[in-house]
Amino acid sequence: MLLLFHSKRMPVAEAPQVAGGQGDGGDGEEAEPEGMFKACEDSKRKARGYLRLVPLFVLLALLVLASAGVLLWYFLGYKAEVMVSQVYSGSLRVLNRHFSQDLTRRESSAFRSETAKAQKMLKELITSTRLGTYYNSSSVYSFGEGPLTCFFWFILQIPEHRRLMLSPEVVQALLVEELLSTVNSSAAVPYRAEYEVDPEGLVILEASVKDIAALNSTLGCYRYSYVGQGQVLRLKGPDHLASSCLWHLQGPKDLMLKLRLEWTLAECRDRLAMYDVAGPLEKRLITSVYGCSRQEPVVEVLASGAIMAVVWKKGLHSYYDPFVLSVQPVVFQACEVNLTLDNRLDSQGVLSTPYFPSYYSPQTHCSWHLTVPSLDYGLALWFDAYALRRQKYDLPCTQGQWTIQNRRLCGLRILQPYAERIPVVATAGITINFTSQISLTGPGVRVHYGLYNQSDPCPGEFLCSVNGLCVPACDGVKDCPNGLDERNCVCRATFQCKEDSTCISLPKVCDGQPDCLNGSDEEQCQEGVPCGTFTFQCEDRSCVKKPNPQCDGRPDCRDGSDEEHCDCGLQGPSSRIVGGAVSSEGEWPWQASLQVRGRHICGGALIADRWVITAAHCFQEDSMASTVLWTVFLGKVWQNSRWPGEVSFKVSRLLLHPYHEEDSHDYDVALLQLDHPVVRSAAVRPVCLPARSHFFEPGLHCWITGWGALREGGPISNALQKVDVQLIPQDLCSEVYRYQVTPRMLCAGYRKGKKDACQGDSGGPLVCKALSGRWFLAGLVSWGLGCGRPNYFGVYTRITGVISWIQQVVT
């Protein structure tokens, strides 16, 4: 600026003014020098004056720029403040009004009138507090008992940095403070004009825009029901013209609601979600169930209190309700116990969440204190399809939190048994706490408890540290996931002589012929011995040394229990059989044909007067899960004709093993209960079931039977086929199938292939003949790669691996 100002003045100082042309007389005289110097002096004085003002101008300019910057920053900062919608849901109790049935019908004039007044009251209440600045919108969507309860939601538009400050607890406290401040006030308060709101009956919960959208989508099919104490209320089914419905359920104040859901169709795609509040708040979801679940045909769900919501989402269109809902109020069950255990090693009782097998409720807390009789013992907890894992840092347990000896563990649903072993180091006992950390719950939890010897936790067996279970050791099957039960074995799946650790095959033990150097294999054959991997356990819980003593015609147990239930496994007088031969009538009298609409689907075996065993994968499709579809034929030989010895049955019950996993084929076993008992004959009689300790020696030749295809990809056979196969060592088969073979599986076949089961044989029996002449069920046709391919064996469900479940169901 100074240079520019100076340059503009330079011509004035350096360019003297000259009179234009000539004077009046036309003689052209110059101007007087004095005038010129005077003008120049004045110009210099003015320039120096301007120069003195320059700092002031600069200062003013800087002030203007700074002010503009501050204002610009302020306004830009203000505009950058992000406003967010904070959604709340809740309820309030009105003391001077009463609920009526008209308020359950959203289309009624009473509902519309009450809603308008209640919404006005709610808005006035909120805007009377410091929240009024942020008020956006609100809605009262339903009413309930109590004398009158209003259910609502509202939205506050707040700066993002204040979002965490306005938690539901803070908002509720502000509203309660406002209500309390006007209780005894004589001044007119707008929101108290028509409603006397109970401050203690106000509840505020966190919600979301998504929750409100879900709620609004159900209001066209909204049902409110109050169920009284001692009442079981069956709920009206959904409106099939709607895509979604909501049942708003309420019971007496001091009770909790129990909802029962029963699926009525074999197949559907409907979704039901249960909430621990009056509306569909995602953070208060108890559980969701989908599509006519076969695994859970009946579900019972507990709320934490007297309010529950059930939301239905339509799946496939149907003229029939795919489910039945009923609800009842129940009393709170205490979940605390103090127990002193007896001085014995078996299971001594059961602990469970309230109303087991109902889903445990949100806010469940159980505390069990158990005292052991001696420090020689530890406490064992045996779970069914449930395991305990170490809790991850700062993450809640979604399936129940356990606290045991200051250890925090999370529950986890699994398709396996599991045991938790707790060492005891003090006589004070052990306290076990179970807590539902979040609203999302699951099926009720049950655990068997008992003692174990801390110095010898698994007598005669191996303690698997992975799952806490006692498993057979050195039997040729890796029962423990890490395989440690089969390491360091001197004699694997054989008998070890005491004298020199020589190994002899098990069938040579107690056979009357000494094989060990000093005859130790023939010692203690007529007396009880400690129980072990291959010892047979009698009904009196004693064990005998002789392998496979069942039904051999000679009592080995003191109580004779090894010779009981032996009317089985005898042949008459005489989906997958490749390289086989046609069977004769009565040759395999336990063989079953499972048919749907006259078409053979799977094989099976008769194991008791009303029970047939088969593979679970025969029913894995929803369309095959209904018992009414199936007909069971026994004594059948030819598929296209009947003979006098064959009989047919309908199915009254279908039970899949609870641990069955479709992808891995693990626990591939199912039981069918027949609609009436069989009449035994030469053509119809059961096969023998092996004990858990029964040993099927690798290399043993056994037989499979069925109507399966005679070659891979071919049609099923018309005649019942039979073929002999050889039992394969577990390690070899597991290697062939890249370690997908589980301890509940066994393999049979030949390296060269050719003889194998095939499509249509699934569920059919693999039977082995004992020295007594009786046939024992070793396996069920399950899976394999192709049919009769070289270097691939057939894989079968190992009956000894699932025999405990079979006996539990059948007996």
UniProtKB/Swiss-Prot annotation:
Biological process terms in GO annotation: BMP signaling pathway; collagen catabolic process; extracellular matrix disassembly; intracellular iron ion homeostasis; membrane protein proteolysis; multicellular organismal-level iron ion homeostasis; negative regulation of BMP signaling pathway; negative regulation of DNA-templated transcription
Outcome of swapping L606R: In IRIDA; reduced HJV-mediated inhibition of HAMP transcription; loss of catalytic activity; autoproteolytic and HJV processing are impaired
UniProt-reported outcome of changing Y418C: In IRIDA; does not undergo proteolytic processing; loss of activity
Protein source organism: Homo sapiens
UniProt entry keywords in alphabetical sequence: Cell membrane, Disease variant, Disulfide bond, Glycoprotein, Hydrolase, Membrane, Protease, Repeat, Serine protease, Signal-anchor, Transmembrane, Transmembrane helix, Zymogen
Pfam families per UniProt: Ldl_recept_a (PF00057), SEA (PF01390), Trypsin (PF00089)
Record topological domains on the Cytoplasmic side: 1-55
Family according to the record: Belongs to the peptidase S1 family.
Enzyme Commission numbers on file: 3.4.21.-
Disulfide partners: C335-C366, C458-C470, C464-C480, C474-C489, C491-C503, C497-C516, C510-C525, C531-C543, C538-C557, C551-C566, C602-C618, C702-C768, C733-C747, C758-C787
Annotated Peptidase S1 domain residues: 577-811
Post-translational modification as stated in the protein's UniProt record: The single-chain zymogen undergoes autoproteolytic processing. This results in TMPRSS6 shedding from the cell surface and conversion into an activated two-chains form which is released extracellularly. The process involves a trans-activation mechanism that requires TMPRSS6 oligomerization.
Extracellular topological domain: 77-811
Biological role: Membrane-bound serine protease. Through the cleavage of cell surface hemojuvelin (HJV), a regulator of the expression of the iron absorption-regulating hormone hepicidin/HAMP, plays a role in iron homeostasis.
Residue ranges annotated for the CUB domain, each copy included: 213-336, 335-452
Membrane-crossing residue ranges in chain numbering: 56-76
Gene name for this UniProt entry: TMPRSS6
Record-given protein name: Transmembrane protease serine 6
PANTHER family per the UniProt record, alphabetical: ACROSIN-RELATED (PTHR24252), LOW QUALITY PROTEIN: TRANSMEMBRANE PROTEASE SERINE 6 (PTHR24252:SF20)
Catalytic residues in the record: H617, D668, S762
Glycosylation sites: N136, N184, N216, N338, N433, N453, N518
Result of changing R271Q: In IRIDA; no effect on HJV-mediated inhibition of HAMP transcription; no effect on localization to the cell membrane; no effect on catalytic activity; HJV processing is not affected
Annotated LDL-receptor class A domain residues: 457-489, 490-526, 530-567
SEA domain: residues covered: 84-209
Main location: membrane
Domain of life of the organism encoding this protein: Eukaryota
